[in-house]
């Protein structure tokens, strides 16, 4: 039974680790598509900057509420919901055709990704010894 419990702990930790790597990709993704956004959709440099910033602002603003939610409902549940929100935001960003949908999608990505690092901290603090 103990071995199975350790396997589950490490599996959840690895899932959160890969999710955090995905978070890093999502943070940098707007830098890759800036030329396409301006050429194909006609976005100005200000709009592109806002698109990139909104994700980071929503990420930062959600840190305290995310911590409260993780403490109340658990890291697994909240990180799962967060990744679903991020996924929907990413799909919306890939299919958007105006700046307002781009803004909404990046806010969703920021909100969704804000829980992953905190969930990792919670899991590590609860499950792994300090040694």
Positions of PLM-derived features:
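Extracytoplasmic
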Residues: 11-45, 66
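Helical-face signature of the major facilitator-like transporter fold
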Residues: 16-24, 56, 90, 98-110
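Small-residue-rich segments within alpha-helical transmembrane domains of MFS-like 12-TM solute carriers
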Residues: 24, 28, 94, 110-118
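Residue-level signature of mid-helix packing/kink "hotspots" within the transmembrane helices
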Residues: 28, 56-64, 114
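Helix-breaking motifs and short loop linkers at transmembrane-helix boundaries and internal kinks
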Residues: 42, 74, 95-101, 112, ...
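Juxtamembrane helix-start elements in MFS-like secondary transporters
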Residues: 44-52
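Conserved MFS/SLC helix-loop-helix module at the cytosolic interface between two early adjacent transmembrane helices
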Residues: 61-100
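Cytoplasmic helix-loop-helix junction between adjacent transmembrane helices
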Residues: 105-131
